[in-house]
From Swiss-Prot:
Protein name: Probable septum site-determining protein MinC
Presence of keyword rRNA-binding: no
Chain intervals with Pro residues compositional bias: 118-138
GO biological process terms, semicolon-separated: cell morphogenesis; division septum assembly; regulation of cell division; regulation of cell septum assembly
Length: 248
C-alpha cells in the first residue's frame, strides 16, 4: 500500500496560547442553585458570559460529585448559557470523573491542588562556604500599547504592568500580571493581577468597562454606580471586594 504524506504545517497550525476561559469554583452540589446563579450572571452580562467557556473546579468540595450529579450540572450550565469545557483539580477521582464525562482535565491545575506524599526530611547538607548574595532580579519592563485595542483583540502583559495610550474597545480584553494604566476610554475588559497579585490596580481616564477584575475578583458594568461612568477612576481589591473610586 502506498504511503500518504500529509503536510500538517499546511493543513493546520496548532498553538497553545493565552485564552479567555472562566473558572467556576464549585462550593456546593446544589445543582439548581448553581444553575440559577449562572443564569442570572449571563442575563446581567450576556456579552461577557453568554456562551463563555467554563472550567469546573471541584477543589473546594469535601467530596467529589458522583457521575449523575456532574452530568446534571453540566447540562444545567449549558442550559443557563455557558459552555463547560473541562474539569480542574487533578486528583485521581476527578481524573476518572473527567473520563466518564468525556471532558478534559486541565493539567495546569494539577500542581496547584494535588496533595503530595510526605517524605522524610533529607539529611542536612555539609556546611558550605558563604557566597555573596546574587543581585536582586530587575523587574520586567512594563508593556506599552500605543494604538487602540479593538473589539475581539486580547492583549496580555506577562509578569509586568500594562500601559495603553489609546482606547480599549468594547469586546476587547487587556490582561496584565501587574497593574493596568489606560489613558483613553475603557469599554472592554481589563484584568489586572492575572497571576493572583491582590495589590495590582487598574487606572483609567474614561471608564465604561464591560468588566474589571483583579486577582480573579470581578465587577461588571451593571454593578458600577452611574456617577463613576465616564470618569477617571482607579480600581483596587480590598478584603476580596472590588473597589472603584474617582480620581478627580
Amino acid at each position: 500500500m502506498a504511503s500518504v504524506n500529509v503536510d500538517f504545517e499546511q493543513a493546520g497550525e496548532l498553538k497553545i496560547g493565552q485564552v479567555g476561559i472562566a473558572n467556576l469554583r464549585v462550593r456546593t452540589l446544589d445543582v439548581p442553585r448553581l444553575v440559577q446563579e449562572m443564569r442570572e450572571r449571563v442575563s446581567r452580562a450576556p456579552k461577557l458570559f453568554g456562551r463563555a467557556a467554563v472550567i469546573l473546579d471541584f477543589g473546594g468540595l469535601s467530596q467529589v460529585p458522583d457521575l449523575a450529579t456532574a452530568k446534571a450540572l453540566l447540562d444545567g450550565l449549558r442550559d443557563a448559557g455557558v459552555l463547560p469545557v473541562a474539569l480542574a483539580y487533578g486528583t485521581s477521582e476527578i481524573d476518572l470523573l473527567s473520563q466518564q464525562l468525556g471532558v478534559p482535565l486541565l493539567a495546569k491545575f494539577r500542581a496547584q491542588y494535588e496533595p503530595t506524599a510526605v517524605s522524610p526530611p533529607p539529611p542536612p547538607p555539609p556546611p558550605a562556604r558563604a557566597e555573596p548574595a546574587p543581585p536582586a532580579a530587575r523587574p520586567a519592563p512594563g508593556r506599552m500599547q500605543r494604538t487602540a485595542v479593538r473589539s475581539g483583540q486580547q492583549l496580555y502583559a506577562e509578569n509586568c504592568d500594562l500601559t495603553v495610550l489609546s482606547t480599549v474597545g468594547a469586546g476587547a480584553e487587556v490582561i496584565a500580571d501587574g497593574s493596568i494604566h489606560i489613558y483613553g476610554t475603557l469599554r472592554g475588559r481589563a484584568l489586572a493581577g492575572a497571576q493572583g497579585n491582590p495589590d495590582a490596580r487598574i487606572f483609567c481616564r474614561d471608564f465604561h468597562a464591560e468588566l474589571v477584575a483583579i486577582a480573579g475578583h470581578y465587577k461588571v458594568l451593571d454593578d458600577v454606580p452611574m456617577d463613576l461612568r465616564g470618569k477617571a477612576v482607579q480600581v483596587w481589591l480590598e478584603q476580596d471586594q472590588i473597589k472603584i473610586a474617582a480620581l478627580d
